[in-house]
Amino acid sequence: MTKAPYPVDLHTHTVNSDGNDTPYELVMNAAARGVKVLAVTDHDVPPPRTAQIPGNGEMDLVEFAKAQGVALIRGIEFSCETSVQDVHIVGLGCDWDGEIMAEEVKKIAHSKAAAYVETVRRLNERGYAMDMEEILSL
């Protein structure tokens, strides 16, 4: 495995958004590459508190990372629309249990659901037969 060019990575994704690794795999790969500080910043998804660790069951992700020599920061990458373009803002050190974050997570879920409905509508309009209920059941 190639050594990381820097010991800090403050913008990573897991399978919870558009990454390829589970939280466990992300930490293990970071540790193997010499990363000392790692932020999990999935798109519009609150960071995981725990992860499934092979042979150990579910563990606190920050504590597991620490045991691997990695300081883990729980973050999020917010998708934002502006009048010019879509932008992404990385949030680190957030109050994950606070009212403001709970409200933002609700807004994100509503926004994503509306976007999926609109995408299906557009695909149907262009002749691709899709049913939202069927998609949600997958």
Predicted regions and their residues:
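Extended substrate/RNA-proximal surfaces in nucleic-acid metabolism proteins
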Residues: 60-138
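An N-terminally biased module of ancient metal coordination in phosphate/nucleic-acid-related enzymes
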Residues: 1-85
